[in-house]
């Protein structure tokens, strides 16, 4: 169990594998929609994670994702295509998670940000509306934009030649006379960005296992307190009296204001009173011990006291 760092400060068992922080369901939907999130116990058992979709083996951040009630994350297009291949008379229990075989449809009595977001997403397709008990709708298929590929340009030499000829024409064009004032060109509109061709020459094997991202949310200028722990020595065995050494170190390092005359007098009076009470207790104990061993105080040794039948 851990405490989420959001303003709600809720106790949660969920742990973000990428940012390495405890998250509640509200932060999970709002800020960690494409992160691998599971229980903290699973993080302790195995901290490795796969940032790719388990259905298409492509990075989860590349397309729109959806999170099931078991907190497994997939591409929405992959889940939709997989469920659309099932027969129309499939029961709601037949739609299962590809990873853990859990139910895709959230239970009716389950309330929470993750379940609500999943219901809103499932309500956009007919196969899920039938499982949720909603009337069917006319689906509008919106094709996803295909990324540009370097293979679209078959002859790069012609492309370079065209670019060179355009630059030569611009250089050969005479500049306008100085007495003609040219209006400044307006900046390009942000709504219509220029299209560029992006060529990725790296291999796709590096995307299968991405390194863990570490985001340290602690301030550098803030010194670690008594309970401060970093990730390196978080699970290291500590000595039995380590807390006492840290406490003494923190007490010795902090500056104290000098005591005033009244405070000194009160402290001396308190110490004197404690010493007087200790002296009284000691003298009382010693006096009782002396009285117990005194024969004059023993009733059996007194000749005027007769014990027994008369």
Curated annotation (Swiss-Prot):
Oligomer status and interactors: Interacts with GOLGA2/GM130.
PROSITE patterns assigned to the protein according to its UniProt record, in alphabetical order: ZF_RING_2 (PS50089)
Purpose of the protein: Required for cis-Golgi integrity and efficient ER to Golgi transport. Involved in the maintenance of the integrity of the cis-Golgi, possibly via its interaction with GOLGA2/GM130.
Origin: domain of life: Eukaryota
Molecular function as annotated in GO: zinc ion binding
SUPFAM superfamilies per record: RING/U-box (SSF57850)
PANTHER family to which the protein is assigned, alphabetical: ZINC FINGER PROTEIN-LIKE 1
Residue ranges of the TM segments: 267-287
Family listed: Belongs to the ZFPL1 family.
Keywords (A to Z) from UniProt: ER-Golgi transport, Golgi apparatus, Membrane, Metal-binding, Phosphoprotein, Transmembrane, Transmembrane helix, Transport, Zinc, Zinc-finger
GO CC aspect terms: Golgi apparatus; membrane
Phylogenetic classification of the source organism: Eukaryota, Metazoa, Chordata, Craniata, Vertebrata
Protein name per the record: Zinc finger protein-like 1
Zinc finger (RING-type): 53-101
Post-translational modification: Phosphorylated.
Domain notes: The B box-type and RING-type zinc fingers although degenerate play a central role in function of the protein.
Zinc finger (B box-type): 1-43
Cytoplasmic side: 1-266
Region (Disordered), start-end ranges: 162-196
Lumenal side: 288-310
Localization per record: Golgi apparatus, cis-Golgi network membrane
GO biological process: vesicle-mediated transport
Membrane topology: Single-pass membrane protein
InterPro entries reported for this sequence: ZFPL1, Znf_RING
Keyword Nuclease part of the UniProt annotation: no
